Curated annotation (Swiss-Prot):
Classification via HAMAP family: ATP_synth_b_bprime
Residues passing through the membrane, by range: 7-27
Main localization (coarse): membrane
Similarity section: Belongs to the ATPase B chain family.
Protein name: ATP synthase subunit b 1
Membrane topology of this protein: Single-pass membrane protein
Coiled coil stretches, renumbered: none
Entry keyword set: ATP synthesis, Cell inner membrane, Cell membrane, CF(0), Hydrogen ion transport, Ion transport, Membrane, Transmembrane, Transmembrane helix, Transport
Subunit architecture: F-type ATPases have 2 components, F(1) - the catalytic core - and F(0) - the membrane proton channel. F(1) has five subunits: alpha(3), beta(3), gamma(1), delta(1), epsilon(1). F(0) has three main subunits: a(1), b(2) and c(10-14). The alpha and beta chains form an alternating ring which encloses part of the gamma chain. F(1) is attached to F(0) by a central stalk formed by the gamma and epsilon chains, while a peripheral stalk is formed by the delta and b chains.
Length: 188
């Protein structure tokens, strides 16, 4: 740093000296260019004496270090942001896949439930049909039995009328005795 400040002072002195000597007049306090050159050299000397170039260099170095640190921090933050973004994208894909699986499972469950409901309905309808057929058969059997019973009752009544008109008292007693004998034989 120190070499840089000396080198910059030397370069400034050489650049400033050329216009002063080019004006012609030589070294004299009446020559304004020379006086300006002297003022410049004194000013530069004061700056060097108070180590202003070193301070400026330190300030520039610290600013450069600060900028470099900020750039490194920005790089680290960018990398962290990229990793977070990749992580969130991965999580989003996983969540989407899980949601797709849930939807697919729900569709399958709904299909299975619909098929089960259809099967249950068919079983229920079959049971109801069987119950209705049983009721119809039972009603038909009851109707047939009732018709037979009425037919038998009518036939018995008709037979009683016919027998009552054609049967004499002696024949009736003989029939009653035969029936009693038949009942006794069957019971013993």
């Amino acid at each position: 740093m120190r070499n840089l400040s000396r080198l910059s002072v030397l370069a400034l002195a050489m650049l400033a000296a050329n216009p002063a000597f080019a004006a012609g007049g030589g070294i004299s306090l009446k020559n304004t260019d020379f006086v300006v050159l002297l003022g410049l050299l004194v000013f530069i000397g004061i700056l060097v004496y108070f180590k202003v170039p070193g301070m400026i260099g330190k300030m520039l170095d610290s600013r450069a270090e600060g900028i470099e640190a900020e750039l490194n921090e920005a790089r680290a933050l960018r990398e962290e942001a990229q990793s977070l973004l990749a992580s969130y994208e991965r999580k989003q894909r996983e969540v989407q896949e899980q949601a797709d699986r849930i939807v697919e499972a729900a569709k399958e469950e709904a299909t299975i439930a619909a098929e089960q409901a259809r099967a249950d309905l068919e079983v229920s309808l079959a049971r109801r049909m069987a119950a209705a057929e049983d009721q119809i058969a039972s009603a038909q059997a009851a109707a047939i039995k009732e018709v037979r019973d009425q037919s038998v009752s009518i036939a018995i009544a008709a037979a009683q009328d016919v027998i009552a008109k054609q049967l004499t008292a002696a024949d009736a007693n003989a029939l009653i005795d035969g029936a009693i004998t038949e009942v006794e034989a069957k019971l013993h």
